[in-house]
């Protein structure tokens, strides 16, 4: 099988949040989101995205601090607009910070940031991050007013929320939501913004979004983590069995993954 990983065509940001979710579910130190990030880079990821939520439900402060100096690509840190999060971002200095809305009761980010309604707060956050040498992105709905507000508050990048497209239940609804995203891309470019997109994208719905020439980067996480369960599962089972058999026979099974 041939994988096309042409650099510069469209960037893939791998979100490692749900590797941390799996780790935290049992209170273990594995799977290690740092290792997941580094392996994603080896596999062709153009950047690593992670969301430090206020409740630390998946990614933890220590993850962000440990990962930042190890990345060969870019870190895209997602966070809410709180002074605590802005100060952490300015301390760690990822290449990119994507400001997102956040509610503790939500399972995942449910919508875009209301830049127009919170203009002063968003603008102030953009200035603080920019002063620390961090490129700022705003996670917003594909709405003309929000896109205009994002440009006005000084953010050079927007990430369009594709959740409504991903959750569409009928062909007509899908077409409407796709057009909304496509129009949002065009509007962002007219305002001189770099346009990224993400949320809810997976292996069978990403193609139309990725085909939009104006999109620079897609950030995808849960779908990749979920798919890895299946495409890597048989190898994981075989290796565990081989380790067990080797231990029973008193032979050595090297960490490289092949029996001695």
Curated annotation (Swiss-Prot):
Gene3D superfamilies per record: Aldolase class I
GO cellular component terms listed in the entry, alphabetical order: cytosol
Keyword Kinase: no
Alphabetical GO biological process terms: pyridoxine biosynthetic process
Pathway per the UniProt entry: Cofactor biosynthesis; pyridoxine 5'-phosphate biosynthesis; pyridoxine 5'-phosphate from D-erythrose 4-phosphate: step 5/5
Amino-acid positions noted as binding 1-deoxy-D-xylulose 5-phosphate in the UniProt annotation, renumbered to this chain: 17-18, 53, 58, 108
Entry keyword RNA-binding: no
Signal sequence, start to end: none
Pfam family name, one: PdxJ
Catalytic residue positions: 51, 78, 199
Binding locations of 3-amino-2-oxopropyl phosphate: 15, 26, 200, 221-222
GO terms of molecular function: pyridoxine 5'-phosphate synthase activity
InterPro entries: Aldolase_TIM, PyrdxlP_synth_PdxJ, Pyridoxine-5'_phos_synth
UniProt site positions, description: Transition state stabilizer: 159
Keywords, in A-Z order: Cytoplasm, Pyridoxine biosynthesis, Transferase
Catalytic activity: 3-amino-2-oxopropyl phosphate + 1-deoxy-D-xylulose 5-phosphate = pyridoxine 5'-phosphate + phosphate + 2 H2O + H(+)
Record EC number: 2.6.99.2
Location within or outside the cell: Cytoplasm
Quaternary structure and interacting proteins, as annotated: Homooctamer; tetramer of dimers.
NCBIfam families membership: pdxJ, PRK05265.1-1, PRK05265.1-3, PRK05265.1-5
Functional note: Catalyzes the complicated ring closure reaction between the two acyclic compounds 1-deoxy-D-xylulose-5-phosphate (DXP) and 3-amino-2-oxopropyl phosphate (1-amino-acetone-3-phosphate or AAP) to form pyridoxine 5'-phosphate (PNP) and inorganic phosphate.
Family indicated by similarity: Belongs to the PNP synthase family.
Name of the protein in question: Pyridoxine 5'-phosphate synthase
Lineage, uppermost ranks: Bacteria, Pseudomonadati, Pseudomonadota, Betaproteobacteria, Burkholderiales
């Amino acid at each position: 099988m041939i994988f096309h990983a042409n650099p510069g065509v469209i960037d893939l940001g791998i979100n490692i949040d749900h590797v941390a979710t799996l780790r935290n579910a049992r209170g273990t130190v594995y799977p290690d989101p740092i290792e997941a990030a580094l392996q994603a880079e080896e596999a062709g990821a153009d950047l690593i995205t992670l969301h430090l939520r206020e409740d630390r439900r998946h990614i933890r402060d220590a993850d962000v601090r440990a990962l930042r100096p190890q990345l060969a690509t870019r870190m895209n840190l997602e966070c809410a607009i709180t002074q605590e999060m802005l100060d952490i971002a300015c301390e760690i200095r990822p290449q990119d910070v994507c400001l997102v809305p956040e509610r503790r009761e939500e399972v995942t980010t449910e919508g875009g940031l209301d830049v127009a309604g919170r203009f002063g707060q968003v603008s102030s956050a953009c200035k603080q991050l920019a002063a620390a040498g961090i490129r700022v992105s705003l996670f917003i709905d594909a709405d003309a007013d929000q896109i205009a507000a994002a440009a006005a508050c000084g953010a050079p990048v927007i990430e369009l929320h594709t959740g409504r497209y991903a959750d569409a239940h009928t062909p007509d609804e899908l077409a409407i939501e796709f057009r909304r995203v496509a129009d949002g891309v065009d509007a962002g470019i007219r305002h001189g913004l770099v346009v990224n997109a993400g949320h809810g994208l997976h292996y069978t719905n990403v193609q139309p979004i990725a085909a939009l020439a104006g999109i620079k980067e897609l950030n995808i996480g849960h779908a990749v983590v979920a798919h890895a369960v299946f495409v890597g599962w048989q190898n994981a089972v075989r290796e565990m069995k081989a380790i067990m058999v080797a231990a029973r026979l008193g032979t050595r099974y090297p960490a490289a993954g092949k029996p001695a």
